[in-house]
Curated annotation (Swiss-Prot):
Record keywords: Coiled coil, Cytoplasm
Ranges of compositional bias, category Basic and acidic residues: 454-465
GO terms (BP aspect): negative regulation of cell motility; negative regulation of Rho protein signal transduction
Residue ranges that the Swiss-Prot or TrEMBL entry lists as coiled coil: 69-208, 260-295
Species the sequence originates in: Danio rerio (Zebrafish)
Keyword Cytoplasm listed: yes
UniProt region (Disordered), positions on chain: 65-84, 432-465
The protein's name: Coiled-coil domain-containing protein 125
Name of encoding gene: ccdc125
InterPro entries (UniProt xref): CCDC125
């Protein structure tokens, strides 16, 4: 009984140490029932810490046992007790071995659980990342689908617009082509009409030059003065074109019609009226110049007389009666001495002694001088106008002489061309006849020449010029 009680008493500290070790393990990692994980945080316990705790507990138990053995050795220290203790020690060693194996297995299970948890955590992270990537990719695909749909709609809309624009431009192009063809036809017709009018104008200008060459210099000058102003752009005014279109006379005989005669008479009347108007304008300008000269002289005379009167009134206001009398005498004496050579003498050869008479004489002389100067100014203006008119006339005469020379040259060239064409025709007729004959040069030349009566004079009239 005593041995069993000792064994039981010896097992008590062992059970206590095992219970403390299990409590330590439970505190290090609490495990739920059914093998489920706890929601609390996982705390890692190293093998060294567990071994140090286990070793401390064994040392404490050994110290307690050694004390007990010393206390018991004093009472009973026999061989049986030693055997019993040896057996207990061996049992304890086996028990410790089993506990170590259990702890090793428990640690291996913990390591496996850790590996599983780490794998699950990695899988959770990977799954979260993949879920986020999938969500982002889905959002991107949705946005891209929206953009693609919008772009497809824009493409279809632009294609429809391009088709409409292409159709409108094709219609415009066809219309412009039709208009261009119509304009080309109209332009060709206008060009033909313009060519005809140019040929007619050239023939008319040639006839006009021939007629001008037959006129004298005075008649030519009158004609050029009354000639209507025409330019290359506008060949005449609307009124002239209406008059030309109203004339329906047939001048087949080469004689001028009544419309042409009336037009020439009206041009002569216009020339006469222009000359009269120019003369009236010249007279008007001369009258204006004379009026301005007399007006300026009269204004200057009035201004000077007024200034003299004002000066005399101011001097009379500031002087007394005696001073006036004395200064009047002195002034009359000085003026008489100074103006002896200037003032005109009387029939007796004496100068008037009265100061008022001398003043009036001086004013009369001054007025005469001013009138003479105004007359000279007017005459100078008139002479300048006359010189300008003479210069203009001289330039016009020189221009007329140049024009007459040019007309004579053109007339000679035209006569030579006419003779050459006539000779060519005669040669063609002679070659085409059956009997070939070579005429004399002098005879053919005399025959081809126009008569002297019908030939216009090429030399200008020097007397008229």
């Amino acid at each position: 009984m005593g041995a069993r009680s000792r064994r039981n008493h010896g097992h008590l500290p062992q059970m206590k140490t095992r219970g403390r070790f299990l409590d330590f393990l439970s505190h290090s990692r609490p495990i739920k029932e059914g093998g489920e994980r706890s929601n609390g945080p996982f705390s890692w316990t190293s093998c060294r810490a567990m071994y140090s705790v286990f070793r401390e507990e064994l040392e404490a138990e050994r110290v307690a046992r050694w004390e007990k053995r010393q206390s018991e050795s004093s009472t009973e220290d026999t061989s049986e007790e030693l055997q019993r203790r040896l057996q207990e020690v061996t049992e304890e060693v086996e028990l410790l071995r089993t506990e170590l194996e259990v702890t090793h297995r428990h640690l291996e299970g913990k390591h496996e659980a850790l590996r599983i948890l780490q794998g699950q955590a990695i899988l959770d992270k990977a799954t979260c990342h993949t879920k986020m990537l999938l969500q982002k990719s889905e959002e991107r695909t949705k946005a891209l689908e929206k953009e693609v749909n919008a772009l497809q709609w824009e493409i279809t809309f632009n294609q429809v617009q391009f088709k409409n624009v292409e159709n409108s431009w094709s219609l415009k192009y066809e219309r412009v082509l039709a208009e261009n063809e119509a304009l080309k036809k109209g332009l060709e017709e206008k060009m033909k009409e313009h060519q005809k009018q140019r040929t007619e104008n050239a023939s008319l200008s040639q006839k006009c030059l021939e007629l001008l060459s037959m006129l004298s210099a005075k008649e030519r000058r009158d004609f050029q003065r009354t000639q209507p102003s025409c330019s290359l752009r506008t060949d005449g005014s609307a009124l002239e074109l209406a008059v030309y279109g109203a004339c329906q006379c047939n001048s087949n005989g080469g004689e001028p019609c009544s419309c042409a005669r009336s037009a020439a008479a009206s041009r002569k009347q216009v020339l006469q009226l222009k000359q009269e108007l120019e003369q009236q304008q010249k007279r008007k300008d001369e009258a204006y110049v004379m009026m301005d000269a007399f007006r300026i002289a009269f204004e200057q005379q009035l201004r000077r007389v007024g200034e003299n009167v004002l000066r005399q009134a101011e001097t009379d206001r500031h002087q007394t009666h005696n001073q006036r009398h004395e200064k009047g005498k002195q002034w009359s004496l000085t003026v008489g001495e100074r103006l002896k050579k200037i003032l005109p003498t009387t029939s007796d050869g004496r100068i008037p002694s009265d100061s008022s008479e001398t003043l009036h004489m001086l004013l009369d002389l001054l007025n005469d001088k001013e009138e003479a100067l105004a007359h000279q100014r007017k005459v100078s203006y008139m002479l300048a106008r006359n010189t300008e008119n003479l210069e203009k006339r001289l330039l016009m005469q020189l221009e007329e002489l140049d024009v007459s020379h040019e007309e004579s040259k053109t007339k000679t060239v035209a006569s030579e061309d006419y003779e050459w064409s006539r000779d060519c025709r005669c040669c063609a007729d002679s070659c085409g006849s059956q009997h070939l004959s070579v005429p004399d040069d002098k005879q053919t030349y005399k025959a081809n020449q126009p008569p002297s009566e019908n030939r216009p004079e090429t030399k200008p009239d020097n007397k008229d010029a």
